[in-house]
């Protein structure tokens, strides 16, 4: 059985284990520089997200299998992107750091996490979900396009884990 729920403090170690596996796989198979151990995402990032109520986890048959951070408002690094709809920060949210444990891959759990984010957005009355994806992260690009996100623009954005790099901005209008 699959469920998406808000994370609680006892989830932290399992979440870190999932993301460590994802980072290892990224570096081994794809070469993408999206995330780096000790840089992003870190235990402190997930701890802060749990405390803020913005970390969500996916459970498969009672075991944690995925995670994502959803924050209200559009990320300021997106600048003046040509979004499909005009909306105030209170009417939008951004999906960050969505990841599925490599041990449970190929079951559509990434799409199910996005569906959970869409359901949360509808519940909160948000008008759009937005996100950025590093241009060489082909698995994430496929996931978001398959889930109904629309490409908006490519922006050079600086993150500690990547330095300045091209990110593709996507939007899902609710």
Q: Predicted segments — roles?
A:
Residues 53-68:
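Conserved beta-hairpin
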